[in-house]
């Protein structure tokens, strides 16, 4: 299964974003940012790829200035691609 990693440069924003997803019933997990992404504060939010459109709209609507990008984490758990 592929996942989307949502990276921020702020741990506070990472946690707040995960809380916003939870409020909307979207399952997410706070994870270590994959080193292949080369961005962020070290923590990111991971969601199933099917929730990517919702996460994208939510990031835009909340205007987190520390947002660093979206990345696809492929099922092998090692391949990361910028979206």
Regions of interest found by a model, annotated:
Residues 1-2, 83:
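Absolute protein N-terminus
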Residues 49-83:
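C-terminal structural segments of small proteins and small subunits
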Residues 2-5, 9-11, 18, 22, ...:
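Amphipathic, hydrophobic secondary-structure cores in small proteins
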Residues 13, 24, 28-29, 70-71, ...:
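Residue-level marker of intrinsically disordered, low-complexity segments enriched
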């Amino acid at each position: 299964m592929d996942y989307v990693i949502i990276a921020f440069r702020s741990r506070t924003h990472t946690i707040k974003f995960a809380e916003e997803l939870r409020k909307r019933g979207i399952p997410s997990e706070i994870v270590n940012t994959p080193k292949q992404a080369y961005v962020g504060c070290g923590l990111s939010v991971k969601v199933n790829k099917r929730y990517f459109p919702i996460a994208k709209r939510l990031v835009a609507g909340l205007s987190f200035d520390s947002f660093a990008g979206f990345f696809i984490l492929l099922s092998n758990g090692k391949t990361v691609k910028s979206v």
